[in-house]
From Swiss-Prot:
Cofactor note: Binds 1 zinc ion per subunit.
Classification via HAMAP family: AcetylCoA_CT_beta (MF_01395)
The protein, known as: Acetyl-coenzyme A carboxylase carboxyl transferase subunit beta
Known pathway: Lipid metabolism; malonyl-CoA biosynthesis; malonyl-CoA from acetyl-CoA: step 1/1
E.C. code: 2.1.3.15
Length: 300
C-alpha cells in the first residue's frame, strides 16, 4: 500500500497535471463561463456564450483589421522620456521600463499601413495594456505621425481607441496632446481624407474629449464604455441618478453620439465598405458616405 501511495499516485497526478496546461482555458469577464483559449482566439476574443467583447492586443487588432499579409508597422518618433522628473510610488522612468517589458510595446499607440478590403489605409491602435492606454507626449507624436503618413499616402486613417484618459505623470504635457491631436484631425480634413474612429471598451477622459469623437464616421464595439468623467463623478456633481446603460455604446447610438455599433467579426468588412464609399465619393460626412442611412445596430 505504501508503494502505491508514495510512488504510483504522485506519478499519475504529475502526468495529469502536465496534460492540462494552465493557459488552456479562460473565463469570460462577463458571464464567467469557461472558454477554450484557442476557440476564443478564433472568435476574435468574443465570448461564444454571451457575446462579450474582451480586450484585444495591438497585434491582434492589426491582424484582424488588415487584409492578410498586407500591413507594415512604422517606427514612431522618439520623445523626451520624463519631462517632469515625476515620481509617485516609483519613478516614471522605472514605470515606463516595467510597462515596456511587460507589454512588449514602446508606448500606448502603434501605427501601421496596409490594405483593408483592398483599399490602402493607415491604422492607429491604442494599447490599453500599456498604462491603461493613457495619452502622453509619445501618443501625441504617434497620432501626428499616423495623420502625416495618411496624407502622404492619400489614404484614410482608422483609429481604434481604448484609454483611461490623460497620463497624470506628464501633467500639462499630456493635456497639450488634446489640441495637438485635434489639429492632426483637421489636417486630414483639409486634405480631404476620411477619418474613421472605432471606439472600444473603455474610451474615456481626454481621449474622448479630443480625437476619439471627431471621426467622419464613429463606430463602436458592443457595450463599450465611452465617456469623459466616470458615472459616480457625474452623479455627485449633478445630484441626479443617471439612466441605465449611460455611457455605453448602445445608449450613445440611441442619442446620436455615434453612427453605428458593429460586432468585432464584422468590423473588417464594414471598414472596407466605408473606405470604398468615402474614397469613391470624396466625402467627409458620414451621412453622405452612407447615403443618409439611419444608425446601424449589430445584427442579432
Amino acid at each position: 500500500m505504501s508503494w502505491l501511495t508514495e510512488y504510483v499516485r504522485p506519478k499519475i497526478r504529475g502526468l495529469l497535471k502536465r496534460e492540462v496546461p494552465d493557459n488552456l482555458w479562460t473565463n469570460c469577464e462577463s458571464c464567467s463561463q469557461m472558454i477554450l483559449v484557442k476557440d476564443l482566439q478564433k472568435a476574435m476574443n468574443v465570448c461564444p456564450h454571451c457575446g462579450h467583447h474582451m480586450r484585444a492586443s495591438v497585434a491582434e487588432r492589426f491582424g484582424w483589421t488588415f487584409d492578410e499579409g498586407t500591413f507594415t508597422r512604422i517606427e514612431l518618433p522618439k520623445v523626451p522620456v520624463d519631462p517632469l522628473s515625476f515620481r509617485d510610488r516609483k519613478r516614471y522612468t522605472e514605470r515606463l521600463k516595467d510597462e515596456r517589458s511587460k507589454s512588449q510595446l514602446d508606448e500606448s499607440m502603434a501605427v501601421a499601413h496596409g490594405r483593408i478590403g483592398g483599399h490602402d489605409a493607415v491604422v492607429a491602435v491604442m494599447a490599453f495594456e500599456f498604462i491603461a492606454g493613457t495619452m502622453g507626449a509619445a501618443l501625441g507624436e504617434a497620432f501626428l505621425a499616423a495623420a502625416r503618413l495618411a496624407i502622404l499616402q492619400k489614404a484614410p486613417l482608422v483609429v481604434f481607441t481604448a484609454s483611461g484618459g490623460a497620463r497624470m505623470q506628464e501633467g500639462m504635457v499630456s493635456l497639450m496632446q488634446m489640441p495637438r491631436t485635434t489639429v492632426a484631425v483637421q489636417m486630414l480634413r483639409d486634405a480631404g481624407l476620411p477619418y474613421i474612429v472605432v471606439l472600444t471598451n473603455p474610451t474615456t477622459g481626454g481621449v474622448t474629449a479630443s480625437f476619439a469623437m471627431l471621426g467622419d464616421v464613429q463606430i463602436s464595439e458592443p457595450n463599450a464604455l465611452i465617456g469623459f468623467a466616470g458615472q459616480r463623478v457625474i452623479e455627485d456633481t449633478v445630484r441626479e441618478k443617471l439612466p441605465e446603460g449611460f455611457q455605453r455604446a448602445e445608449y450613445l447610438l440611441d442619442h446620436g453620439m455615434i453612427d453605428m455599433v458593429v460586432k468585432r467579426p464584422a468590423l473588417p468588412e464594414m471598414l472596407g465598405r466605408l473606405i470604398g464609399l468615402m474614397n469613391h465619393r470624396h466625402v467627409n460626412a458620414p451621412g453622405a458616405a452612407l447615403g443618409g442611412a439611419a444608425p446601424v445596430r449589430p445584427a442579432a
